């Protein structure tokens, strides 16, 4: 029994690392003939369905390089038949759970209430992790992480007042599908199946009741193709891989069950980029192989672009991380050593003054002690020159400074100054801190796209008193046992290297109202109604 329990914990650690996508990928290449599929000539009663392929950490330059080298023929084919937008603004923090929540709800974290991959709940008085690194996995309650990731994220943490695209599709009387996406809440009842060894050896139940889209596929927990088993093995990350996603999408196509909207997530590129850096194209090549399998399910690629609309996109960029640990990493525990910081994996103690939640190149620092001065804490943080942004909230205002800076920027929503997205603001102080150019009461953003709204969204994403810090490109934040990506790359920050993603659209001449992920939802709903 002890062996079973230990093995189950190992399995939990492996799965809980999947959401972070920080583990090196060792999967074999995709075999396109692994599941024979009959060509589909009529896709149910849907006129022209939309298939959205989200490739984790897809960026413009490596995408173009993969196409130029002839190693991404499927993406090249769609590129030649569609419209390409190389710079779409992501959400903030630039972490998948927050970005996907923004895409599905059309709101920033101040409304959808998913602050990041890790955050502190003042209501539950505990840390929330939707994924973790291997060292963290030895200290954190893994069953709780799994429960948070597969159940609470969608069923309790994601704000019920912000409707997801799947919920709105259901209210319109239309079906939608989610394949391996992290955020998928909808209105149809489903049962997620927990692997038997894990449910027998941990407090986790054998089944979890959830609500999702009409068609829900989520790794080993729920699948559409009843005979697909190989891609759900432990060595294939329990189904959280590109091939599983592709085969599930191909199954819908071949059985004429494709709904008006299908959101399909290809996770593996993120792992390659984390390990090898932002210039690598190996993950894109693998994603392209998976995409080929989806296109082939139509019988030909020509039929694929004639019978469906295609949206291929990334969720965040990544910044290269320097190879030397001492230079690249900023240990928040050392900087904040005068304070008592809560220990990872342990209940919050009455004596604890701070909780730190790192999200790679960004962190939330929570003040638990009501007598602790955020101003004093910020002054201590300012001693570190590698901090790009340091922000706190005062009433309705966000106050911004930076490492080795003596100036501040204060702003709030509403006012006489307007930006490119028709958002209005009142701003005082040093505009250079957020690289803002203001002329004739109009804001032009620089290296922090949509900086005011995105930072405001994170600054108002949860209860409590806290600071937000991000680091300059080349650097990464660490605390107790948090993962690092030395010589590779990481994301999480507000900087453009983490924030800009490509968008490839085939089958429609329309585009989102603005080139921001927050505006994709309304556009996708319009496509579903055409």
What do the predicted segments below correspond to?
Residues 161-163, 351-511, 521:
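Active-site neighborhoods of enzymes that stabilize oxyanions during catalysis
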Residues 2-10:
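Bacterial N-terminal signal peptides that target proteins for export
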Residues 26-28, 107-108, 113-274, 429-432, ...:
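His/Asp/Glu-rich, glycine-adjacent segments
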Residues 18-21:
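C-terminal motif of bacterial Sec signal peptides marking the signal peptidase cleavage site
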Residues 64-119, 177:
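Short, structured active-site-proximal loop/turn typified by the sulfatase FGly-forming signature C/S-X-P-X-R
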Residues 239-253, 260-262, 269-310, 320, ...:
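A long, amphipathic alpha-helix that forms part
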Residues 24-83, 94:
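Active-site-proximal N-terminal segment of extracellular/periplasmic enzymes that hydrolyze or transfer
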Residues 298, 305-306, 314-367:
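Acidic/histidine-rich catalytic neighborhood
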């Amino acid at each position: 029994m002890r062996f079973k329990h230990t093995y189950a914990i190992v399995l939990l650690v492996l799965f809980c690392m999947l959401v972070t996508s920080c583990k090196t990928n060792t999967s074999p290449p995709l075999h396109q003939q692994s599941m024979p599929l009959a060509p589909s000539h009529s896709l149910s009663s849907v006129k022209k369905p939309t298939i959205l392929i989200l490739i984790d950490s897809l960026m413009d330059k490596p995408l173009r390089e993969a196409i130029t080298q002839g190693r991404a023929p499927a993406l090249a084919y769609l590129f030649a038949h569609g419209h390409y937008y190389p710079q779409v603004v992501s959400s903030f923090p630039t972490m998948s759970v927050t970005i996907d929540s923004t895409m599905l709800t059309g709101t920033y974290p101040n409304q959808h209430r998913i602050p990041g991959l890790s955050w502190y709940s003042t209501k539950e008085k505990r840390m929330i992790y939707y994924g973790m690194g291997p060292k963290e996995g030895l200290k954190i309650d893994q069953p709780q992480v799994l429960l948070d990731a597969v159940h609470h994220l969608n069923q309790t943490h994601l704000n019920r007042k912000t409707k997801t695209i799947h919920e709105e599709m259901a209210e319109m009387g239309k079906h939608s599908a989610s394949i391996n996406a992290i955020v998928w809440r909808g209105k149809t009842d489903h049962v997620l199946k927990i692997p038997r060894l894990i449910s027998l050896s941990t407090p986790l139940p054998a089944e979890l009741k959830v609500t999702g889209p009409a068609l829900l596929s989520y790794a080993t927990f729920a699948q559409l193709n009843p005979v697909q088993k190989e891609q759900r093995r432990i060595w294939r990350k329990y189904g959280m891989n590109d091939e599983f996603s592709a085969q599930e999408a191909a199954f819908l196509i071949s059985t004429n069950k494709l709904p008006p909207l299908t959101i399909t997530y290809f996770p593996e590129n993120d792992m390659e980029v984390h390990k090898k850096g932002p210039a690598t194209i190996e993950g894109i090549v693998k994603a392209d192989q998976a995409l080929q399998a989806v296109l082939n399910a139509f019988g030909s690629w020509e039929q694929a672009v004639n019978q469906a609309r295609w949206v291929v996109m990334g969720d965040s960029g990544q910044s290269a991380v320097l190879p030397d640990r001492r230079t690249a990493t900023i240990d928040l525990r050392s900087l904040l050593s005068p304070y008592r910081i809560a220990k990872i994996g342990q209940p919050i103690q009455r004596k604890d003054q701070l909780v730190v939640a790192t999200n790679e190149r960004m962190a939330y620092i929570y003040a638990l002690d009501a007598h602790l001065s955020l101003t004093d804490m910020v002054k201590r943080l300012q001693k570190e020159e590698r901090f790009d942004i340091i922000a706190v909230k005062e009433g309705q205002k966000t106050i911004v400074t930076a490492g080795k800076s003596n100036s501040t920027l204060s702003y709030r929503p509403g006012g006489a100054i307007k930006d490119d997205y028709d958002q209005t603001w009142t701003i005082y102080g040093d505009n250079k801190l957020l690289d803002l150019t203001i002329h004739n009461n109009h804001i032009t953003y620089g290296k922090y796209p949509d900086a005011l709204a995105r930072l405001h969204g994170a600054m108002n994403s949860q209860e409590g008193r806290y600071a937000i810090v991000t680091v300059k490109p080349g650097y990464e934040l660490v605390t107790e046992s948090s993962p690092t990506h030395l010589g590779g790359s990481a994301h999480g920050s507000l900087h453009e290297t983490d924030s800009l993603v490509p968008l490839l659209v085939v089958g429609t001449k329309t585009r989102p109202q603005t080139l921001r992920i927050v505006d994709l939802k309304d556009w996708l709903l319009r496509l579903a109604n055409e």
